[in-house]
Structure formats: C-alpha cells, structure tokens
C-alpha cells in the first residue's frame, strides 16, 4: 500500500481526520523533500564535475542513483498539486511516468548500497589483495549495474499496469497488488539482509588480518546499513502489515458513502494510530532520496568542503584552466614579459641565467642542463 493513495478519499477514524493529516503531510514533506533533494542532487553533480571521486567505482554507482533520484524528485510536485486541488495534473502518461520512477527510486537507492558493499566484499574474498585493480573492479561493477538496471527497469515497467487515473486522481499500486509485497521483499528486506551478511563477513575477515585495510571504510558501510534499517524498515514493515487500505478499511471499519464523499468511521483508536504511523514512516522512508546519495558520496571521497570552495569561487571570479601557481609561468602563459625567457610568436628559447657574480649558472647544471642542451631546447 502506498500512503499517497490515502488522500484520494475522505478518511475519518473516530475523531481523527486522517485526510487533513495526509494533505498536510504531502504538501509540506513532499515540498521540503523536493527542494532539499534537488539541491543535494545538484550539489553532488557539480562535485563530480569539479573533482572526480577518489573511488571511481562508487562514483559510477552514485551517478546512476543521482539520475533516478533527480527524475523522481521532479515528479513529486505533481503529488503536491493533487493533494491541494484534488485532481491530477499531466494526464495518464504523467501518472504512469511518476509511478514508474517512484518505484525505480526505491530499488535503485537500496540496491546501489548492495553493489557498493558487494564490491568491497568481493575484494576481501580475493586471496591476493595486490591483484585487485581499479579496472577489474570497474568492469565487475559495470556488469552488476547492468543486471540491476535491467531488474529495476522491468519492475518499473511492471508498475505501469498498477498505476492509473480514477476520478481525475492518480492512484499508485496498493497492498492488494503483488508489486506491493515485491517492493517490501526485493525493495528492502532481501537487499538489507544481503548487506548485513556481507558486512559481518568483512568484519570477521579483517579481524584475522595483521593490518587494518582502511580502504574498506567498514564504519561507513555499517552506518549505511543502519540508515537503511531506520529509514526504510518501519515503512515497509507497516505497509506489508496493513496491506491494501481498502481491504484494511473493509476489515476494521464500517463503510458509509453518499453522493458527495466516501467516509470511513470506527471507534477504535488503534486504527487511527496505524494510519498516522503509516504517514510518518513514509515521510522517513523518502529521505532515501538524499541520505543514500550522501553516504555514497562519502564512500566515493567527493570532499564536499573542497567542492564548496570551488563553487563559491566560481560565482565570484574567473577560474583559470591552467595551474598558475608559479608567477613566472603565469606571466609566460598570459603573454607578459618575462626577463628569464626570450618570448617569440613561434618559440620560446631559454637563456642561461646570469649569477650576480658573473659566474656560470650552476643551478641549471645541477638540474642536468648544459650549454649545448640549452641551445637546442625550445618550448613550442
């Protein structure tokens, strides 16, 4: 069951009006998630352009996650519009498109963590760690990413059959659909168990070594596992427990309908608590749109502070492409007069530097230059 389907009907459980809660949730939390998520996505994208990650393999996976997240975040305002106006904007195509990338975001965020953990676990399983190369890791990761992309695309296309417009409102798949339980199993439970097993195996393997392989970043992997447990676990557990909201209502509530609205009443306060918990846990679950990319960027070594300085400098001054730390080289590259160089349009010949005492230039000889090599050496 997806919590976005809750605001399509007027829902009252005893004295608790769940409709107002869900409307406020969608308008506030989805708006905040959109702005924060897009800002972080843009920031990490610029970080990748300005400074390549230290770990190219994790950087490759992080880029795939950022692309899916960006498309999913762009569609979130459509749900805010539906919550505010009670109708869907964009037609049947945009409804299915939003549902497809919302589903793909669930799988890509969680399974990308599996790929990163698998890469480090596979390296630790090698008998000779010196044989591990970046090229081999990249090829292996590309193969795993290709398989994952096919799986995510297939499930995303399958979600098109579960997403449709009814009464001018977009309905995602709900608990009575097989896809809802598949999401709970393959979208969270199975990948999280795989991550936990591999991390435990890595810890046991490294405890037997005489040195500490810090490149594994085991502490960050454990934080990643803990983040997925806290953010994704409550929502998928409660969603699988409640099932379809329609069947949940039919089992636990008395259905009253009229020509204007459809309302649900029941005196048991526990049902209102379950609806409120479902909304709150879903708000926690969508934090994966920026929590997972931040963790992956940390593993990739983006160095956010360095990138932030480059971004602020970009806004204030022109950035030179060359490294102009040496003042003499700076003048030469800018075409300014330099007393140590004979500058001409075709070539630049190096003149021997004269010492204050009139002696020979021993510094150039120490560097391996003699007069014959200097006469034959030219730049350009």
From Swiss-Prot:
Transmembrane segments: 26-46, 60-80, 97-117, 145-165, 184-204, 220-240, 275-295
Pfam family for this entry, one: 7tm_1
Main location: host cell
Domain of life per record: Viruses
Region of interest: Disordered: 328-380
Cystine connections: 95-170
Membrane topology qualifier: Multi-pass membrane protein
UniProt entry keywords in alphabetical sequence: Disulfide bond, G-protein coupled receptor, Host membrane, Membrane, Receptor, Transducer, Transmembrane, Transmembrane helix
CDD domains: 7tm_classA_rhodopsin-like
Any single Gene Ontology cellular-component annotation: host cell membrane
InterPro entries: CCR1-9-like, GPCR_Rhodpsn, GPCR_Rhodpsn_7TM
Family note: Belongs to the G-protein coupled receptor 1 family.
Name assigned to this protein: G-protein coupled receptor
Origin species: Elephantid herpesvirus 1 (isolate Asian elephant/Berlin/Kiba/1998) (EIHV-1)
Lineage, broadest ranks: Viruses, Duplodnaviria, Heunggongvirae, Peploviricota, Herviviricetes
